């Protein structure tokens, strides 16, 4: 499987934003038209987009659903995969997105609070449609928009969700997220080596070199947000770097 660079389109209050370490009000980027942003990434070569409804993740209300629907439609028309997370709390929430044409739904808090949901969705739609987000802070899992910490480690949870039917994992290192100070590949590598399903990395990418470092962990791809939006590097350069690595 080729390592993939996946642009993030994070939405809050109808805008495309980038937060520092997930903290509301810490926007370093705020753009008015998420659909235009998504189309721009597709035009620059993205094969997959990563959509997050931050209002859904933080407040449990999926306020950005109408915009997400438009972006999903655009992706389908252009043959681009799309993974969506944030505020997916129930089987019905997930099913409505998958029926809309979303390639993969990302379960965070809901999976950790109700692991059986992963099995139900995997049985109904196939494991490839189900991704579980493991967000780690100080080596422990964090939930509810990074506001609560759990006792379990990413490796423990990753193995459990693989058994329940998750087809992939999204691993975010909150310690480096949004800071653009570089990645810490150790925790990602540890998780990759502990499970047999693909692991997508996220958090802290600030340079093209970081992409190479994460590729070497065995991760299947990386979600990139702040570095692209603030011009640290272009998506075209990122795709080229990975192709030549």
Curated annotation (Swiss-Prot):
Keyword annotations from UniProtKB, A to Z: Amino-acid biosynthesis, Cytoplasm, Histidine biosynthesis, Isomerase
A Gene Ontology biological process term: L-histidine biosynthetic process
GO CC field: cytoplasm
Claim: Isomerase is one of the keywords in the record: yes
Listed NCBIfam families: 1-(5-phosphoribosyl)-5-[(5-phosphoribosylamino)methylideneamino]imidazole-4-carboxamide isomerase (TIGR00007), PRK13585.1 (NF010112)
Similarity-based family: Belongs to the HisA/HisF family.
Protein name: 1-(5-phosphoribosyl)-5-[(5-phosphoribosylamino)methylideneamino] imidazole-4-carboxamide isomerase
Organism: Methanosarcina acetivorans (strain ATCC 35395 / DSM 2834 / JCM 12185 / C2A)
